[in-house]
Amino acid sequence: MPGSIRIDIVTALPALVEEPLQHSILQRAQESDVATLQVHNLREYATDKHRQVDDRPFGGGAGMVLKPEPLFRAVEAIEGAAGEADDIIYLTPDGARLDQSMANRLSMEGHLILIAGHYKGIDQRVRDLLVTREVSIGDVVLSGGELPALMLVDAVVRLVPGALGDSSSALTDAFQDGLLGAPVYTRPAEFRGHEVPSVLRSGDHQAIARWRDEKRLEKTRDRRPDLLPDTNNDSTEASSQ
């Protein structure tokens, strides 16, 4: 029985991707039919005897570029077997920034195909004619798109109903409501002179909720003020009325 979300990853380096999919939440999601995760070796879709998937860029320059033919064949074969994808995503530094809002939206789609670029990138015609969404993990360049693809898979699958043992866990993650997470503690209650805040041991659930909300707001204001409403603009607008 197929999972409620299917994600296919196309890569020239499948070994970088396959192993992490067999652990923790991603493994359990597959075993419980919540997710179907498939890795496709791009070289299997090359037709020359050397299984070449890259070539030198027109116009010169350093680096190699992934060829369009194998990428088109791979995506067309996947869609021929599993149906049309809701999104064909290329992982690239110049894509839209992956955030919790995007992960939430993607978790509601039924079928995603991820293209992990490598070398200098992929032929622009693949981006123009095949890709429907381009995603970045931030302003940093990695050797390839395999690690970003894994990050996207993990961020999305854990939001699919049934992926987590406690479904409320995903709802309390950082960024779900625009704030960073509160500090968390476990046993022992005292460690090297540092004690767990007494409110967390009080059993007063309302007080605990207030404490966590205060700490989340405090941390967000300190570390990521960009996530908070622009109170300065609000006050300026109010004073001008």
UniProtKB/Swiss-Prot annotation:
Q: Provide the residue positions that the database annotates as binding S-adenosyl-L-methionine.
A: G117
Transferase in keyword set: yes
Its Enzyme Commission number? 2.1.1.228
Q: Where is the composition biased (Polar residues)?
A: 230-241
Basic and acidic residues bias: where?
211-227
Pfam families per UniProt = tRNA_m1G_MT
**Annotated family:** Belongs to the RNA methyltransferase TrmD family.
What name is this protein filed under? tRNA (guanine-N(1)-)-methyltransferase
